[in-house]
């Protein structure tokens, strides 16, 4: 029987979410935990991949379990095996044809920054210097909305069949200010039907250049039209990036028995 699993993780100690040879990954830890309980391999199919150092407040994956396997207390048992920086929230039954990656309707990422030195933000927020113009960055971010070719924000070596993505929201949200009204923490929020590798970090890096006045607001449209990675800014560091939400159609979820 197929199940969707919902979990979160701090990506600081992992070489990304997806399994790869001779590397510690989130998928590898999940498959190890399932195998210990099931006493047999249990391949996990992730909803997507995150790079090394990137975090997820909500990630989904699907796994096929034996029909007779009891799922009561499974979340508790798996959390007892998983490392402290991976937390399983729930396991829900889905249709046999449901796919964690291909059935996703949208994904939302947040990029979190701070202007202050804070030891409690190490690895979870990117520290930037003051002076960012958030009004300019939000005007530039508005150019991202819609279905467009985002090759300029993609890794150069990639095997994707299309660079088109549909972005439905992209904006900066002010989180904290000091007593003088200066921004000390902010978050960039972006939602799309799909994302290219390194896309969010490349967008944020380009927005930083606009925010600091190194580029004009109109340059964002020029970068998009170039279809060339070298036209965009440097990628922002991985540490401030979080996958925060993945949306699915309700039709793929099976009714949960209350008996």
Where are these regions (language model features)?
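Structured-RNA-binding interfaces characteristic of tRNA pseudouridine synthases
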Residues: 1-259
